[in-house]
């Protein structure tokens, strides 16, 4: 069963209604896409509270000591996090790292929480995914932002003590298009009756508390819409039907979960009816920071392996690090790790200060981190050669260091899909980047807008662009010697300022050229966003290097900016010189079967099963596979 097909217009309306329409705080990322390098929003470099840092350092020391006792290879081999590891994490308060101390949690800042995830994930990435899904999108964060005091007192102490939570939105036939959500929550006396099936619920087999998104039918006294609930996993009618298995993250407890006539008390409603997607997206503004924390750990691991191996491995009379083909890979890994760490630290501290709107910045670091970590790990595997492709267990059996290079590559792959795929992140960020334009000129390109609305929008747009466009012609980045406070990195900051204005001009040209069709130019929008990510990363790297005053940091920031500028310039060129239109036309012919002969010569794909499984409402017909700690 799945909900009837939802039209493009309705899907867009649902997505638009879910986003935060207002910008109550300034945003460095928003200004960057408008051609304004607002360094005052990130400079001077934020400083974490010394007392909070001291407490966090003490905790991180304990967490490190525990992490050193974990057998990461056992988790990979058994595809299971041992009970004693879960109990140990609970004993350390790891399930309550972000929960306020008054509810029994540790109250770590975003900065130190992400450092904890980076650390524990280095023992095995499944551990980082467990804690991230639990705290960043599971019950704690939505309740922190939207929950009532009664809900916080009821649920947060349980979680802080070690109960696991999960977030359930995706369904067998519903992924990035939530307008088609099929799960329903029918109002009944005292609450709601929940029915539906949820797919890919990370922590689902372990969780005792669930955040569930479901459609509330519109009726008298009920505004309806996608709504968020806290659901007790032990409630009658909840069945964990299957634990899913994946390419990587083999310790992940990910489930298919069925709800059949599950009673959810009224007091378990989070926020208001119809507010579910807004809650999910708002939660992800800071929740997304946990994913690049895992990516940063992979970058650090890749750098450590590349450095030590390439110094020890001798080929043609020299360490392989001395050969240019390998040296360039090492330099890329080192520079990118520095850039990613700078972005993540900056975003975390901005979130902790709570003076800026970081929805664009957090999305950019998620996008950049997931893409670049994959490339860094791939280069590390290449540096290792055949040993990079060999499993850690096989290496150890031959008496060599058990380096899980191939595992890291497998574990990382999901990050380009988790919490918004790269393609969806491009569109999400692009929508926020052009918000200023749509707020003044959106009605001009809206086919359903009346003539009166279009006329008023034209007047607004004329006034806005008369002020804005002249600011894109000249800027501080064209003044020799500007940004001198950045020392040898000043030239990179001048580039960021110039490129920011160029980026804004290119975006404006595209809007003028394609108008309402711009949303379909996904290749163009993706490149615009990727350029913005590079400029944000350069700003963060230079700001960090300047603040820390470490010569090694300045060297790494310079190296990163040199590489980032090349990538940005390639994308600027590709904005208008590309094969996008040809590719779209070719893809249409491929799908129509014109080139099906290319598929000959191999065995056919399996004929059994559906591409997307169907489901029927009703009680579960399979055994519950819920995992309970012994």
Report the location of each language-model feature.
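Flavin-dependent oxidoreductase catalytic core characteristic
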Residues: 1-134, 143-153, 157, 161, ...
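Short beta-alpha junctions and helix-cap segments that line functional grooves
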Residues: 155, 170, 180-181, 197-199, ...
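Short Gly/Pro-enriched turn/cap motifs at secondary-structure boundaries
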Residues: 173-176, 200-203, 220, 246-253
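A short core secondary-structure module
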Residues: 195-239
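Glycine-rich active-site loop/lid that clamps phosphate-bearing ligands
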Residues: 237-246, 251, 255-257
């Amino acid at each position: 069963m799945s909900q009837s097909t939802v039209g493009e217009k309705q899907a867009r309306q649902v997505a638009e209604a879910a986003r935060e329409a207002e910008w109550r705080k300034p945003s460095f990322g928003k200004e960057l896409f408008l051609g304004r390098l607002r360094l005052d929003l990130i400079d001077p470099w934020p400083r974490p509270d010394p007392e909070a840092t001291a407490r966090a350092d003490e905790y991180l020391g304990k967490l490190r000591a525990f992490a050193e006792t974990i057998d990461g290879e056992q988790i990979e081999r058994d595809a299971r996090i041992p009970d004693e590891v879960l109990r140990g994490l609970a004993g350390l308060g790891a399930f309550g790292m972000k929960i306020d101390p008054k509810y029994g949690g540790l109250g770590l800042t975003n900065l130190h929480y992400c450092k904890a995830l980076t650390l524990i994930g280095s023992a095995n990435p499944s551990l980082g995914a467990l804690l991230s899904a639990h705290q960043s999108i599971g019950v704690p964060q939505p309740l922190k932002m939207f929950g009532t005091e009664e809900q916080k007192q009821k649920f947060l102490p349980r979680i802080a003590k070690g109960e696991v939570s999960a977030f359930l939105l995706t369904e067998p036939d519903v992924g990035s298009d939530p307008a088609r959500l099929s799960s329903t929550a029918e109002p009944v006396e005292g609450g709601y009756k929940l029915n539906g099936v949820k797919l890919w619920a990370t922590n689902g087999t372990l969780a005792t508390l669930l955040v569930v998104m479901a459609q509330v039918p519109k009726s008298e006294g009920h505004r309806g819409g996608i709504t968020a609930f806290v659901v007790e996993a032990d409630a009658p009618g909840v069945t964990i039907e299957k634990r899913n298995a994946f390419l990587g993250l083999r310790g992940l407890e990910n489930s298919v979960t069925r709800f059949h006539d599950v009673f959810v008390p009224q007091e378990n409603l989070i926020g208001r009816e119809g507010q579910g997607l807004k809650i999910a997206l708002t939660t992800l503004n800071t929740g997304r920071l946990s994913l690049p924390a895992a990516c940063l750990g992979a970058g650090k691991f890749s750098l450590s392996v590349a450095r030590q191996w390439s110094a020890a491995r001798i080929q043609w009379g020299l360490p392989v690090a001395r050969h240019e083909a390998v040296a360039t890979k090492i330099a890329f890994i080192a520079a990118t790790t520095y850039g990613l760490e700078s972005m993540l630290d900056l975003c975390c501290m901005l979130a902790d200060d709570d003076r800026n709107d970081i929805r664009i910045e957090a999305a950019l670091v998620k996008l950049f981190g997931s893409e670049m970590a994959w490339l860094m790990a791939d280069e590390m595997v290449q540096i290792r050669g055949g040993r990079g492709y060999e499993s850690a267990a096989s290496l150890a059996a031959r008496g060599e260091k058990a380096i899980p290079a191939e595992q890291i590559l497998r574990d990382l792959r999901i990050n380009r899909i988790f919490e918004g795929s790269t393609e969806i992140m491009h569109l999400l960020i692009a929508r926020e980047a052009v918000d200023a334009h749509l707020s003044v000129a959106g009605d001009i390109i809206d086919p359903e807008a009346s003539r009166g609305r279009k006329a008023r929008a034209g007047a607004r747009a004329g006034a806005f662009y008369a002020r804005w466009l002249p600011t894109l012609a000249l800027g501080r980045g064209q003044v020799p010697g500007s940004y001198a406070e950045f020392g040898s990195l000043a030239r990179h900051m001048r580039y960021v300022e110039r490129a920011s204005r160029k980026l804004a001009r290119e975006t404006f040209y595209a809007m003028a050229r394609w108008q309402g069709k711009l949303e379909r130019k996904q290749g163009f929008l993706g490149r615009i966003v990727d350029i913005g990510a590079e400029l944000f990363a350069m700003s963060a790297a230079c700001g960090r290097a300047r603040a820390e005053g470490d010569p090694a940091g300045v060297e790494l920031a310079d190296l990163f900016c040199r590489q980032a500028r090349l990538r940005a310039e390639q994308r600027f060129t590709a904005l208008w010189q590309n094969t996008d239109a040809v590719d779209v036309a070719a893809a249409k012919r491929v799908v129509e079967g014109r080139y099906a002969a290319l598929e000959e010569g191999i065995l056919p794909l399996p004929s059994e099963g559906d591409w997307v499984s169907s489901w029927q409402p009703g009680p579960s017909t399979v055994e519950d596979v819920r995992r309970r700690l012994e």
